[in-house]
Amino acid sequence: MEDKHGIKDKVAGKLKEVEGKITGDKAREVEGKAQQAKGKVKSKATEVKEDLE
């Protein structure tokens, strides 16, 4: 299954962010936020592509 909407990245990123907050690992927290942003970009790109079709 293709993750066209970035859902996997959004969920995995949120989990990493929460894990980082709980453990005090700032790098893990930032990594999670970056992965969430990647998911949002994928989602927006898919939305734009669908609008153009």
UniProtKB/Swiss-Prot annotation:
Biased composition range(s): Basic and acidic residues: 44-53
Domain of life: Bacteria
Positions of region (Disordered): 27-53
Family: Belongs to the UPF0337 (CsbD) family.
Protein name: UPF0337 protein LJ_0034.1
Native organism: Lactobacillus johnsonii (strain CNCM I-12250 / La1 / NCC 533)
Species classification: Bacteria, Bacillati, Bacillota, Bacilli, Lactobacillales
